[in-house]
Design a protein with these regions (language model features):
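Conserved ATP-binding module of the ATP-grasp superfamily
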Residues: 66, 74-77, 96-101, 115-151, ...
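Glycine-rich phosphate-binding loop signature in dinucleotide/nucleotide-binding domains
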Residues: 16-21, 94-95, 134-135
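Short, charged, surface-exposed secondary-structure boundary motifs
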Residues: 13-17, 56-62, 174-176
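A conserved helix-loop-beta module that forms one wall/lid of the active-site cleft
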Residues: 45-111, 116
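Short beta-strand-to-turn element immediately C-terminal to the catalytic PLP-Schiff-base lysine
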Residues: 82, 112-118, 154-157, 164-165
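Phosphate-binding core of ATP-grasp and ATP-grasp-like enzymes
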Residues: 132-136, 146-182
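Short, well-ordered alpha-helical microsegments
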Residues: 32-34, 88, 149-150
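ATP-binding N-terminal substructure of ATP-dependent carboxylate-amine bond-forming enzymes
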Residues: 1-53
Length: 183
């Protein structure tokens, strides 16, 4: 049973004050991207989770890629950000058959489509780009990287930085990395 709408920051703060909550642990991506940690902090309630500014690295694929490029981090694939289909076909041709199309926002783990897995042609990629545009979004087209994906979460209080063990998120519905992404 959901007590309140966790995507409404004001309701979260009101509920926390009313119930004398002194520490909130925020997990879902939407409230983090909406700045609930910031608002709880302003209300004097401690919260575990990134601020709205820090959550941008998860909430925006283009922000994350631009950050890698800005700081010369060698893990950045060749990419471009688009708001329309202008230039997409030419960039897909440049990338060849190894490409990825990513919705530039939160999509519950379902905004990324990879060539060979979800997209079997440049035409299918263009259709997905059109779907994103129809919803008013922008998107990233990038070269497909091959290898093991992992997540590394780190925690900081502003002075100390502690890394958790690297983990893998197996999103596919079926064994053997098959089936649709589950989010």
């Amino acid at each position: 049973m959901q007590v309140i709408d966790i995507n409404n920051n004001e309701l979260v703060v009101q509920y926390s004050k009313k119930n004398n909550i002194s520490l909130a642990i925020i997990g879902p991506e939407n409230p983090l991207a909406n700045g609930v940690v910031d608002m709880l902090g302003e209300a004097g309630i401690q919260a575990v989770g990134p601020t709205k500014e820090m959550a941008k690295i998860e909430a925006s694929k283009s922000f994350a890629r631009d950050l890698l490029l800005e700081y010369n981090i060698p893990a950045c694939p060749k990419y471009k950000v688009f708001k329309s289909t202008e230039g997409v076909k030419a960039f897909l041709t440049d990338l060849g058959e190894g490409f990825v199309v990513k919705y530039d926002g939160l999509a519950g783990g379902k905004g990324v489509k990879v060539s060979g897995d979800h997209l079997n042609s440049h035409e299918e990629a263009m259709k997905y780009c059109d779907e994103i545009i129809q919803k008013g979004g922008k998107f990233v087209v990038e070269e497909k990287l091959v290898g093991e994906e992992f997540s590394l979460m780190s925690f900081s209080d502003g002075k100390t930085l502690i890394h958790m063990p690297a983990i893998q998120d197996h999103k596919r519905a079926l064994d053997g990395d098959l089936g649709p992404n589950t989010g």
